[in-house]
């Protein structure tokens, strides 16, 4: 591969050769654009729109449009895109990922493809990782777009519905990945189409694309309401778990990030909970709580995985070190941590709507992204999102010196060496950014530096508010900044003249992350736009990466050398062992994400069907034909599932059939068994359908045609939503137990697809039955008005969200329970065949 690259160039170099002629055309138009008057810019925008309407393609107008934006930026904000930024703009317009190093002006680059694609009138979303960056980037670039006659909006967390509609109605909309995703989910829960805020998803430019599409890929967006389970069991399970002895009663698997009971632990559980067989299916509730309590107490670490703030457990993002306000671990883990830490245990939530970032962003017509580090994950971008990665050349050559890793035997020796290095460089005034992997480590290092009298600033999840301000001073002379991982990403570190003379920004990594990309991001904070700088990672054999994934061979060599804890090793073998450990973890994580996507694709296809149908109900005014089809399906399926063809059971079956339909849509005693006992199956269907349709027609006359249409719409939407929420829960439970199928020589993914599909079919029938039932039992005093309905859900990311009333869960019949209609058959073989 290396030889081929030398002959033909890398993939990026080959692709850039195709982009260069386009950029030459853009640059050639520079003089023409400079001759335009200010008022001509808006006229050019109108001209482009008109050309597109007449059939020209975006690529036809691209050189001229890019040249126009370039000149507009120069006149409004005093910045002119240089050649490399124009290349980046073309790559993004083509629906690719542009790898642009820190400080190369990604925010300015985005204006080029955003403007061109906004000319279609279908909207462009520019996605950033937090509200601060979304607002900052919008404020910085708005003068450029407005000068060109385009409207630009920003979606912030605290906006109301009208403000969101206005922002999404703009030509270009800035916002965070979570706001865009949650708005999509909320739009699919509204009762009136006027309440929707988003348009169809057209073109998205994702800033820090690796962070959003890879690091966050496993994080589902969940809108939840409050569940109804008691929280007491979490406290009991916590009390039991704290009485256990490590290794004897339970074991911890660090690679899998889990803990499980040993045989001895199981015996203790049976005695404590007074059950005969802990593994019994009827004890699943106990198992669930114990597993989560074990994980909370012995796997999850305070100030690394979560932190406590004002009596609340906040998740700490493992990639950015930021506190994820309002986000909660799912599946009861958050409650188990609350019980462990002795804070108030909140009730488990019920999922009302959910989607992963993977599936949300794959819905855009065109997707592109920017980041400083994407190449290590190129395969994943290509395989999952169909995006290729193009490395954009830097404007100035990178002058940063990346030193080899220094490896120590113990963590204590490593931190002593880090402090010595900081003290040494502090004396000559060189600014330093020290990256740590957890709050705990950053605070430990901070106290060591205090003892040495080195002034410094700490940036971690606890001080999130000051993040941008702290990071903006990190390039000043003699400034030492300790930051958890990638905190402050998106804010440039600019060097002062004195700092530059002292050697530029020194990056010190206190531990290798399990992903090479995160390490590269930390390195990339130094050496922006040709600035001087330096980087070095300090590693110990006690670090998580080396301990869990490193090779025992290294440990053996170190032991043979008999190194003291503060003696360092610099060797190629150790460096390559670290890299292979990282590759191992990256491969492992990619496989996990791929498998999760296979599972998520099942429910994603189902979600698409439900949301598409829901949208049609919202848009369509008249559902009469659909309702009549539902009535026919309910009646016909009821007849098919109740009548077996066994003569001696015929009368009983007819009675059960009539009872069943009386519960749904027939008035009592309207149809008697004797009226239908001499008819064939087909005649019974027609007779019953005629009776039900007559009632429907009568109801329509009583209530009024306009009102009944509105009632049908509201009932159908409510039933779809309720059944879909229950289905999400059911699919979740199915997924949790599906791994055990491997023991039965079954492919778990195939089993999940097959059973999930069956459950979906059942849900569709349930929707029909319940819609008909509610419609035939509705009594109207006053017509429902088309007014703004109160939201009954809260998003799980919103710390200020109002506490909602618990959703009442209907008593649901198990598939293997006896059917309530009295037939003596199992529910799944009787009414359950259609419900």
Curated annotation (Swiss-Prot):
SUPFAM superfamilies: Helical scaffold and wing domains of SecA (SSF81886), P-loop containing nucleoside triphosphate hydrolases (SSF52540), Pre-protein crosslinking domain of SecA (SSF81767)
Positions annotated to bind ATP: 85, 103-107, 492
Superkingdom to which the source organism belongs: Bacteria
GO MF annotations, alphabetized: ATP binding; metal ion binding; protein-exporting ATPase activity
Location of the protein in the cell: Cell membrane; Cytoplasm
Binding sites annotated in the UniProt record for Zn(2+): 819, 821, 830-831
E.C. number: 7.4.2.8
Entry note: cofactor: May bind 1 zinc ion per subunit.
Protein family membership: Belongs to the SecA family.
Function: Part of the Sec protein translocase complex. Interacts with the SecYEG preprotein conducting channel. Has a central role in coupling the hydrolysis of ATP to the transfer of proteins into and across the cell membrane, serving as an ATP-driven molecular motor driving the stepwise translocation of polypeptide chains across the membrane.
Binding partners and assembly: Monomer and homodimer. Part of the essential Sec protein translocation apparatus which comprises SecA, SecYEG and auxiliary proteins SecDF. Other proteins may also be involved.
PANTHER family: CHLOROPLAST PROTEIN-TRANSPORTING ATPASE, SECA INNER MEMBRANE COMPONENT OF SEC PROTEIN SECRETION SYSTEM
Protein name: Protein translocase subunit SecA
Native source species: Clostridium botulinum (strain Hall / ATCC 3502 / NCTC 13319 / Type A)
